[in-house]
Amino acid sequence: LSLLIELINKLNISNKNNYQGEKMPIYNLGKKEPQLPSEGSYWVAPDAHVIGNVILGQDVGIWFGSVLRGDNDLIKIGNETNIQENTIIHVDPNTPVTIGNNCTIGHNAIIHGCTIGNNSLVGMGATILNNAKIGNNCLVGAGALVTENKEFPDGMLIIGSPAKAVRELSPEMIKDMTRSSKHYVDNFKKFIKELEEIK
């Protein structure tokens, strides 16, 4: 047991609780430490990983299989944003990631060194590359490839590979994106209470 404790100390693994008293997979990397809201106001799934220089806002959900690796620069996730299954978020030196409030990042997305505005939705399997900027209230379609340094204004539907803005979103679609982020806040709170591993 003493050897295990010594190994954990050497790895500098943080000790954050989630459902059923288990440990969330949240890690310091040397002097780079995740900044987290109060316990119960965020959730990191048991097999997701939050590493290093990462800031999580209030009511953020990091879902199964996702990796946020803040080794080279900052990853900042806004309030009530959800990062869905198997998403990869990474940074190069001097290319941080900023994701705004009330965002939905769909399954299997790749978010790398870019900025995503408030209340935006990134569809399943989309890729957004270094120094790209997505405005507020935007929808990046499933499978889209947003290339480096590309910028899009607020309220746009962005699709294709390479991605292009094809039209403005309707007020109804923007409201739907807000509802999506609110739903995922309710959902992670349900998982905190009800998720239990079968022994």
PLM segments and residue spans:
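N-terminal hydrophobic alpha-helix used for membrane targeting or insertion
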Residues: L4-I5, V140
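Intrinsic disorder/low-complexity signal
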Residues: I5, Q20-G21, P46, Q58, ...
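Glycine-rich hexapeptide-repeat left-handed beta-helix
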Residues: Y19-E39, D71, I77-N79, E85-N86, ...
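Short, Lys/Arg-enriched N-terminal segments with co-localized hydrophobic residues
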Residues: I5-K23
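A positional/architectural concept
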Residues: P37-N82, N86-V91
